[in-house]
Amino acid sequence: MRNLLLACLAFPFSLFGQDNAKPLSIKGSFKNVQPEPEWVYLYHRVNGTSVKDSCKVIDNAYTFTLKMVEPELLAFRVKYANAGSAKQFTPLAGGSTSNQSRDAFNVYAGDGRIRINSTDSFSNVSIKGSKHHEAYLALQALRKPYDDKMKVLYQDYAKANAKKDTEARDRVEAQIDVLESDLKENVLSGYIQKNPSSPAAFYALQQYAGWDINPDKVEPLFNALPAAVQEYPTVKSFKEQLETAKLTGIGRMAPEFTQNDTLEQPVQLSSFKGRYLLIDFWASWCGPCRQENPNVVKVFNQYKDKNFHILGISLDRAGQKDKWMKAIHDDNLTWSHLSDLKYWDNAVSKQYGIRAIPQNLLLDPTGKIIAKNLRGEALAKKMEELLEGK
């Protein structure tokens, strides 16, 4: 359920220079595309920051020249003559192309020369010159049956959520979880194992790992990547995330930390030993977090007198303590709360490798991590298993 519920995302990329950059030349053209394209926008990353480049269309053609330090999923969008400004566009979450707009498309590219021809519509493209994109399309073809089913389930989830039909929503969520697991194991993992040297292998690994890396499954796949690929800046950053995940996986002792509470008093994680503890990463600005809070409140109220406590870690922003406090009050979160108000630079979230929220970890009374990312009925069932009759 990652793409639905992990809607609050961080994009931590290592900063890097362009000393090893190689040129990428992109030439595009149009045939029978109406309305008439006026501008083409290209979204990519430079030194870890999202950048939008633009090119005015002249004689049904456009050109971009980039410096590439590693392969990247590029996003293209169009502004038509006499039309409003193009909206912000980035590559689709999860890598799916099933929801692509007529006015947008993605290209997975490295260095070299690429030719893009659009016929009848902007996104009806033929792309030549990129072995990376050919590998990407082959992977997308394997994904497509799953993505098509996922699209329908997402629509069902949205309908149930709009009707506040929690039973139907939870049922669809369970179906999505199963389908995502099947996609990862049957398509992504298999693709990497069979094609570790493919230009799209690391892209597939990113999709497989998701926002909550399982090091036992991910590390063998990572180690199969060619040594040259492991030197790419983003791959090195991924390796760091993998190492962090190894320290915070199920069965490991939760790393110690200290952070201030709402009264600016330092609180240590170890002070909660002796109780089952749910470490809950959230923020007042995170819609999915706020949506999940009633479920967490229900479980807390049921088990708070049975050796169970919750420790909230907020990723709220500097200067917005009032919003953090208001969310605590409005959502009736009557447990312990910590934050350094540093947004995605929250020290605890970085220590634990948190790159999307909501996320949580369940600790046993010794401080060992025994479960992760329990939501809704899953959290209630786990606590019933651990504490009923005690």
What are these regions (language model features)?
Residues 1-28, 389-390:
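Bacterial Sec-dependent N-terminal signal peptides
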Residues 18-178:
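A non-transmembrane, solvent-exposed segment enriched in polar/low-complexity residues
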Residues 75-77, 84-104, 114-117, 181-253:
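N-terminal targeting signals for export/organelle localization
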Residues 237-270, 335, 382-389:
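N-terminal "domain-start" segment that seeds a small globular fold
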Residues 273-277, 281-298:
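Conserved redox-active cysteine motifs that mediate thiol-disulfide chemistry
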Residues 291-331, 341-350, 381:
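Structural microenvironment flanking redox-active thiols in thiol-disulfide oxidoreductases
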Residues 333, 340-388:
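Thiol/disulfide oxidoreductase modules built on the thioredoxin-like
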